[in-house]
Each structure stands twice: as C-alpha cells, then as structure tokens.
C-alpha cells in the first residue's frame, strides 16, 4: 500500500512524462500485487482549486474525473478525518505550511505507508518515507 501526492495523481492518470520511472513502477507494482493506492480526499480539493485558478485543465469536469479515478481497481480515496486534521498541525520536526501537503503527509504517517511525491520539501522531510 502507498499514498500518492496530488501532482503524482494527475501525472499518473494523464500519462505525463514528468512521472519518474521509479514512481510509475511503485504505483503499478502496488496495483498488480492487489494492494491499494491511497489518495487523500484533500487531493480532490487541491485539483479543484488548481482548475478554478486556471493552473490545471482536465479532459472532463472535475467531478467526472475524480469519479473515474475512484473506479480504478485498487485506488481508494481516504477522507481527512479528525485525527488526520489534528495530526497535520502537529507534524514533528520542521515542515512547511502548505495545508494540502500537511494533510497528505499526516495521512501517510497515520497509515504508516510510503508517499509517492516529487515535492522536494516532502522528500527532504525526515518523518515520512517517500518514493520518487
């Protein structure tokens, strides 16, 4: 089981070449093994915000896109529950202030699973295992 960051989700679904071979392999091996690829529900919010700001264009409306992603075998969205919300404000060490990143990292820590991300700020954070 692993969790993917928002940009990784977009790159993976769209087949974007920005997705590293290591990240693609980790996602594919996870799905092929019958395990789950986890996506924080904050990613749906983040994608919607990027669309509203004109920074992301999808091939369909965001509701349909998220619905299609959720239909992929082995992909599961996890809601931001109270524990994740609270833990995102109490991350150990020095971590940047991006709320979505904090929620995703808190989810990875709660589930004790690696996070697939290209975000250097997260990769350099010593309190979560990353893949990229």
Residue ranges of predicted features:
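Short, well-structured N-terminal submotif of metal-dependent ribonuclease cores
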Residues: 1-39, 53-68, 111, 121, ...
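Short aromatic/basic micro-patch
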Residues: 3, 38-41, 79, 116
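Alpha-helix capping/helix-boundary segments
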Residues: 8, 43-44, 84, 104, ...
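A general structural signal for well-ordered alpha-helical segments in protein cores
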Residues: 20, 44, 63-66, 81, ...
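Phosphate/NTP-binding elements of NTP-utilizing enzymes
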Residues: 47
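Active-site neighborhoods of divalent-metal-dependent phosphate/nucleic-acid chemistry enzymes
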Residues: 57-59, 72-118
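Active-site regions of enzymes building and remodeling cell-envelope glycoconjugates
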Residues: 127-132
